[in-house]
Swiss-Prot record:
Species this protein is from: Saccharomyces cerevisiae (strain ATCC 204508 / S288c) (Baker's yeast)
Subcellular location: Nucleus; Chromosome, Telomere
Misc. comment: Present with 907 molecules/cell in log phase SD medium.
WD repeat segments: 24-63, 70-109, 212-251, 264-307, 310-350
Protein's UniProt keywords contain Cell membrane: no
Pfam families xref list: WD40
Oligomeric and partner information: Component of the Set1C/COMPASS complex which consists of SET1(2), BRE2(2), SPP1(2), SDC1(1), SHG1(1), SWD1(1), SWD2(1), and SWD3(1).
Chain's role: Component of the Set1C/COMPASS complex that specifically mono-, di- and trimethylates histone H3 to form H3K4me1/2/3, which subsequently plays a role in telomere length maintenance and transcription elongation regulation. COMPASS recognizes ubiquitinated H2B on one face of the nucleosome which stimulates the methylation of H3 on the opposing face. SWD1/CPS50 acts as an assembly and regulatory hub for COMPASS complex formation. Serves as a highly utilized surface for COMPASS interaction with the nucleosome.
Keywords, in A-Z order: Chromosome, Nucleus, Repeat, Telomere, WD repeat
Entry protein name: COMPASS component SWD1
Length: 426
């Protein structure tokens, strides 16, 4: 049913509540990522395969790399370009690959390192720049895929600053600021948080450095409006900061807002994710064989508002489609993908105002004038008045009822039938 005809209180729910689907992936999911508009879900698998599912049918439609060139070890991260045409994948096979989904048979470009890749994110998709973290490296790498792939260390440019800086440990995670795309945030194995200002491939500047914990920083996320930063650490605590960057991108100010912990079970957290826009909610997956839930907190008050249940195993990666308001997470043991969605009951009275649901059949009583003949002249006059109303069937609405932009560019992925049949038969 058209979403505009649904119950507005159900449509505008800010987070899903019920497990609605389970996607069985025979190749065992390691990581996952929605396309920018939520039309597709990319799954990185344990054998190095990349499988893309259509979220309308919950069926695979594309397996990039059917003419060699696919990863040969588990995929560690996936990143979509804003238009949904390009994909970045990193893997434990020491390589990062760039895929053009209009020609998915083999990677468009790739670059290899000397150790496994922790993760990779877009820095500027238009210029084909990305940033990656490598196993047991003290600095992140900026990679340029515009021509022949080139990698450069994201290091402190000032030697005096470098000599006076204590050991930060190995770089584990990184993210790019959503409102200041030239600001790169890096987390290390010794709890340091470093902010870099990117000028060019060979020129970077460390503008702020702060030690927030003595343990590993496992995950960094920035809200869509750029005002909140959440940090998942191995000390069983998720820290939420208000982040402020000046107009010249030269100074950073962090203010601690909340700390999220499971004070009863002392659980660690596998993955964290903000909701859209102002990040009113924060969702996290729990670590441990006995923990099978996703926790959702309200970021303003720091209170737990929802626990998503239904999975029968530990959950790892998380992603949130804000168009359909669905959350997905992959299971640790089976590799299946669990989908939580907003369940909207059909509101048929929107189509027929006198519609009423009944629990059992009732005898219909005909009204006295229900089937009386209508004067043809009056009927014709009413039809003419209705025909005079102009109906625009071409102009698309810019925003849906949740405020998501409907006019963003979307790429349609061609279906790869042959590879899908081989995957399902394996």
């Amino acid at each position: 049913m058209n979403i505009l005809l649904q119950d507005p209180f159900a449509v505008l729910k800010e987070h899903p509540e019920k497990l609605t689907h389970t996607i069985e992936n025979p190749l065992r999911t390691e990581c996952l990522q929605f396309s920018p508009c939520g039309d597709y879900l990319a799954l990185g698998c344990a054998n190095g395969a990349l499988v893309i599912y259509d979220m309308d049918t919950f069926r695979p439609i594309c397996v990039p790399g059917n003419m060699l060139g696919a990863h040969v070890r588990p995929i560690t991260s996936i990143a979509w370009s804003p238009d949904g045409r390009l994909l970045l994948t990193s893997s434990r096979d020491w390589s990062i690959k760039l895929w053009d989904l209009s020609k998915p048979s083999k990677p468009l470009k790739e670059i290899r390192f000397d150790s496994p890749i922790w993760g990779c994110q877009w820095l500027d998709a238009k210029r084909r720049l990305c940033v990656a973290t490598i196993f047991e490296e003290s600095d992140a790498y900026v990679i340029d895929f515009s021509n022949d792939p080139v990698a450069s260390l994201l290091s402190k440019s000032d030697e005096k600053q470098l000599s006076s800086t204590p050991d930060h440990g190995y770089v584990l995670v990184c993210t790019v600021h959503t409102k200041h795309p030239n600001i790169i945030i890096v987390g290390t194995s010794k709890g340091w948080l470093d902010f870099y200002k990117f000028h060019s491939l060979y020129q970077t500047e460390c503008i702020h450095s702060l030690k927030i914990t003595s343990s590993n920083i496992k995950h960094l996320i920035v809200s869509q409006n750029g005002e909140r930063l959440a940090i998942n650490c191995s000390d069983r605590t998720i820290r939420q900061y208000e982040i402020s960057i000046d107009d010249e991108n030269s100074a950073v100010e962090l203010t601690l807002e909340h700390k999220y912990q499971d004070v009863i079970n002392k659980l660690q957290w596998n993955c964290i994710l903000f909701s859209n826009n102002t990040a009113e909610y924060l969702v996290a997956s729990t670590h441990g064989s006995s923990a099978h839930e996703l926790y959702i907190w309200e970021t303003t008050s720091g209170t737990l508002v929802r626990v998503l249940e239904g999975a029968e195993e530990e959950l790892i990666d998380i992603n949130w489609d804000f168009y359909s308001m669905s959350i997905v997470s992959n299971g640790f043991e089976s590799g299946n993908v669990y989908v939580w969605s907003v369940v909207i009951p059909p509101k048929w009275s929107a189509l027929a105002p006198d519609f009423e649901e009944v629990e059992e059949n009732v005898d219909y009583l005909e009204k006295e004038d229900e089937f009386d003949e209508v004067d043809e002249a009056e009927q014709q006059q009413g039809l003419e008045q209705e025909e005079e109303i102009a109906i625009d069937l071409r102009t698309r609405e810019q925003y849906d009822v949740r405020g998501n932009n409907l006019l963003v560019e979307r790429f349609t992925i061609p279906t790869d039938y042959t590879r899908i049949i081989k995957m399902q038969s394996s």
